[in-house]
Amino acid sequence: MNTDDVLAVFREAGAILEGHFILTSGLRSPVFLQKARVFMHADKTEKLCKALAEKIRAADLGPIDYVVGPAIGGLIPSYETSRHLGVPSVWVERENGVFRLRRFDVPKGARVVIVEDIVTTGLSIRETIDCMKDLGIEVVAAACIVDRSAGKADVGTRLISLAAYEVPAYPADKLPPELAAIPAVKPGSRNI
């Protein structure tokens, strides 16, 4: 599965939106990938996550003990990808603004892959890595369905992406006039 195939799945689901969006990262963009419209379809989710699992397997990372998903966006793709890898899925969630592994016991030294939905700046993955390091858990790689930065985001580890789809993103004070003229909406989940 390549970038065009992934974007075709997003288009079929009506998940590529145009307008003025405030991304979870705080950046602004004329394009928003509404992955919830994809993930509401089990067949589309399975297709994408099975392909991502195959790409993770092909990366020859050695044994993987768990897949970790940052809540909220990483919950569905991490679970479905773990199913195809045949390993358990756990997640981190925010507690006072910091990712914590609250509901699971993962042993020190466990080898994990972090699976995210969409990467723009890599912040959620970096925060998940910090949480794992604090617990003595080894992050062998991160993976995502779509890398909006097309490889430019610093995620703090190797990033395996199913699709690289570079979409412009701007700080709020550096918007192009045509984007500034459109009212902004904030569909992301960072502060949930």
Swiss-Prot record:
Pathway: Pyrimidine metabolism; UMP biosynthesis via de novo pathway; UMP from orotate: step 1/2. Disulfide bonds: none annotated. Orotate binds at T120, R148. GO terms for molecular function: magnesium ion binding; orotate phosphoribosyltransferase activity. Keywords: Glycosyltransferase, Magnesium, Pyrimidine biosynthesis, Transferase. 5-phospho-alpha-D-ribose 1-diphosphate binds at E116, D117, I118, V119, T120, T121, G122, L123, S124. It catalyses: orotidine 5'-phosphate + diphosphate = orotate + 5-phospho-alpha-D-ribose 1-diphosphate. The keyword Lipoprotein does not apply. GO terms for biological process: 'de novo' UMP biosynthetic process; pyrimidine nucleobase biosynthetic process. Its cofactor is Mg(2+). Homodimer. Belongs to the purine/pyrimidine phosphoribosyltransferase family. PyrE subfamily. This is Orotate phosphoribosyltransferase. The gene is pyrE.
